[in-house]
């Protein structure tokens, strides 16, 4: 339990000044922010964790993590038996795609549903709908044309419902701000000021009509895509959060109330697109009374359901391949660690569910699973002498280097060796160049940082915050979780682009920082009970004598909010020379890994929310 104290919060100037000063600038950061990434997927928050040191089969005293057993076995494949791989379903899907394209292309003033007084909001509605339903990949050209049209009418005061609307409209402007910003259009959040009164409150009536509530929903969604220094976005988030939470207490249970609940739950930086699509399918269009609009929502909904279920037939094939890799690699002999390959595959499927990204999904699942095993090996199971030997032999990158290693390390060495080499061959096919040495260096740096932390544990040394933070940038695992999987995609990453998304780019730094900071807030108590004293919390308290755990947590949570805005800027900066499409997958890796810490340490306690995610997005089909 955090210690409650009346000691004032330590000044932000006491800690990583460059981070704080940079975060509050709207423009791109001028200084490199010291970062820390993911508190390696899986540090436990289970208070019942065993910290004993049993004698292992080799007679060595070893610590244990006390993790629960693997939740999934080969029987999971049986749950993925689905008829939706049949050609008839795919053919129906193709027909629906054509019909939805016609919906985009038929938007004109000749359509009686559209007029110069509502055409802008109608166009935005269609784009927003296909994106939230997870079917937007089929309509890239149509979305681009639609948003170009909307942007051509964008003003400093926002937009109205239609091109001839006299007064700007909050719903249209908020939805337009969010959607245009996410697609790289240079739109300023200052437009929202025109909807505030003198007290900073956003214009709304006390009646709380459905239309007004939907306006505030879109205001809230827009506020999450804030850049550093945008005070109006902070005000919009505070106002809309309060408004929607109060509205939920008053309105009856309906698809609107469920949508509001889902939106409040779906934090932008832990939002998984496939999970969002699954949830939105349940509420989309249910309250539609207009006949023609109902027909449109029905087509969109049917396509979304088909797409969701058809993808599961591909997931069955991929998961079967992953389970064979796990078994053939001998992971079942590694009993000291967590086994989360199914969970990591689920996360990968939630951020990249386009069929062509199979290598990314499998590569991400494998890399993250190996990271987890290495984490437990360095933090808990290995002796300091064994770990130093393993670290040195990794640099040789030669199977003969395993001759001097303990049996369990021989297996891990060859698993890592084979995995990195395999993904390098896949990356060479995709990128047209050899990236093995690049990947090897990333893994060597990562393992060196683990070794540093193992030494801290062995000696009981508590580093300064900056010392801990610098090493943690590498030990986060974010870089090695993202690097090789994205290189296997059919997206070109020439050297000049790669250096803007990989280490030492700000995008990589900030993505790592948010995971380290959030991970430490979820895991520090269990880590400390296990003998791992160093964390963002303990190092902050060391640097700021008199600060309590509550002070440290409050400060770190504030920093996390600022880092999120910086990460938004790095992804969406309209003046960047790097396309959003090239940066998005690194950003999405951050979202996926961050999701594991949304409620607790979901990598060690994976039998609650993480298990639910597997069930809802991987194993359960959408009913028709």
UniProtKB/Swiss-Prot annotation:
The keyword Zinc-finger does not apply. It holds the Pfam family Terpene_synth_C. One of its GO terms (biological process) is green leaf volatile biosynthetic process. Mg(2+) 2 binds at residues 375, 379. It comes from Picea sitchensis. Belongs to the terpene synthase family. Tpsd subfamily. A motif (DDXXD motif) lies at residues 375-379. Residues 44-56 have a biased composition (Low complexity). The gene is TPS-Phel-4. It comes from the Eukaryota. Residues 1-48 form a transit peptide. Its cofactor is Mg(2+); Mn(2+). Binds 3 Mg(2+) or Mn(2+) ions per subunit. Keywords: Chloroplast, Lyase, Magnesium, Metal-binding, Plastid, Transit peptide. GO terms for cellular component: chloroplast. Its EC number is 4.2.3.52. PANTHER family: OS04G0344100 PROTEIN-RELATED. Pathway: Terpene metabolism; oleoresin biosynthesis. It is an enzyme of class 4 (lyase). It is found in: Plastid, Chloroplast. One of its GO terms (molecular function) is magnesium ion binding. Terpene synthase (TPS) involved in the biosynthesis of monoterpene natural products included in conifer oleoresin secretions and volatile emissions; these compounds contribute to biotic and abiotic stress defense against herbivores and pathogens. Catalyzes the conversion of (2E)-geranyl diphosphate (GPP) to (-)-beta-phellandrene. It catalyses: (2E)-geranyl diphosphate = (-)-beta-phellandrene + diphosphate. Residues 41-60 are annotated as: Disordered. Mg(2+) 1 binds at residues 375, 379. The Asp-Asp-Xaa-Xaa-Asp/Glu (DDXXD/E) motif is important for the catalytic activity, presumably through binding to Mg(2+). This is (-)-beta-phellandrene synthase 4, chloroplastic.
């Amino acid at each position: 339990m955090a210690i409650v104290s009346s000691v004032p919060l330590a000044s932000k100037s006491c800690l990583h000044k460059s981070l704080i000063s940079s975060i509050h600038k709207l423009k791109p950061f001028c200084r490199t922010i010291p970062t820390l990434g993911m508190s390696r997927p899986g540090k436990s928050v289970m208070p019942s964790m065993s910290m004993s040191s049993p004698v292992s089969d080799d007679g060595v005293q070893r610590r244990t993590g006390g993790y629960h057993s693997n939740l999934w076995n080969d029987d999971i494949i049986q749950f993925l038996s689905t008829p939706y791989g049949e050609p008839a379903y795919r053919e129906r899907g193709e027909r629906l795609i054509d019909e939805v394209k016609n919906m985009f292309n038929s938007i004109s003033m000749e359509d009686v549903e559209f007029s110069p007084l509502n055409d802008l909001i109608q166009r935005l509605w269609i784009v927003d709908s296909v994106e939230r339903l997870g079917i937007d990949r089929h309509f890239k050209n149509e979305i681009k044309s639609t948003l170009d049209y909307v942007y051509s009418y964008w003003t400093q005061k926002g937009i109205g419902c239609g091109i001839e609307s006299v007064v700007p409209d909050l719903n249209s402007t908020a939805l337009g701000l969010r959607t245009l910003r996410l697609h790289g259009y240079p739109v300023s959040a200052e437009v929202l000021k025109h909807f505030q009164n003198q007290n900073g409150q956003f214009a709304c009536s006390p009646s709380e009509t459905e239309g007004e509530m939907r306006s505030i929903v879109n205001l809230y969604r827009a506020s999450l895509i804030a850049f550093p220094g945008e005070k109006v976005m902070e005000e919009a988030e505070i106002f809309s959060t309060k408004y929607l939470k109060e509205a939920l207490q008053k309105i009856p249970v309906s698809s609107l109330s469920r949508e509001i609940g889902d939106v409040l739950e779906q934090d932008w930086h832990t939002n998984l697109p496939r999970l969002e699509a699954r949830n939105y399918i349940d509420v989309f269009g249910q309250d539609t009374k207009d006949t023609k609009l109902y027909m449109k929502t029905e087509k969109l909904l049917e396509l979304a359901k088909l797409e969701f279920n058809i993808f599961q037939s591909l997931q069955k094939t991929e998961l079967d391949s992953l389970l064979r890799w796990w078994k053939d690699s001998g992971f079942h002999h590694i009993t000291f660690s967590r086994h989360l390959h199914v969970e990591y595959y689920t996360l990968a499927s939630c951020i990249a569910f386009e069929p062509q990204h199979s290598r990314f999904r499998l590569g991400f699942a494998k890399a993250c699973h190996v990271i987890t095993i290495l984490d437990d090996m360095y933090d808990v199971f290995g002796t300091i002498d064994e770990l130093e030997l393993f670290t040195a032999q990794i640099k040789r990158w030669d199977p003969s280097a395993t001759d001097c290693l303990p049996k369990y390390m021989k297996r891990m060495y060859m698993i890592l060796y084979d995995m990195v080499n395999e993904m390098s061959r896949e990356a060479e096919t995709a990128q047209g160049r050899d990236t093995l040495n690049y990947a090897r260096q990333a893994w060597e740096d990562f393992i060196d940082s683990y070794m540093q932390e193992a030494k801290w544990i062995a000696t009981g040394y508590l580093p300064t915050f900056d010392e801990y933070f610098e090493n943690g940038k590498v030990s986060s695992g974010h870089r090695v979780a993202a690097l090789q999987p994205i290189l296997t995609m059919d997206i070109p990453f020439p050297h000049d682009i790669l250096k803007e998304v990989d280490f030492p780019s700000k995008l990589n730094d900030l993505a790592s920082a948010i995971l380290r900071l959030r991970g430490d807030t979820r895991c520090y108590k269990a880590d400390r009970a296990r003998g791992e004293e160093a964390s963002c919390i303990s190092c902050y308290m060391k640097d700021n004598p008199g600060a309590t755990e509550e002070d440290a947590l409050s400060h770190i949570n504030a920093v996390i909010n600022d880092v999120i805005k910086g990460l938004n800027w790095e992804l969406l900066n309209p003046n960047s020379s790097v396309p959003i499409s090239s940066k998005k997958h690194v950003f999405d890796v951050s979202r996926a890994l961050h999701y594991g810490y949304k409620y607790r340490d979901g990598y060690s306690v994976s039998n609650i929310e993480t298990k639910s995610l597997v069930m809802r997005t991987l194993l359960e089909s959408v009913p028709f």
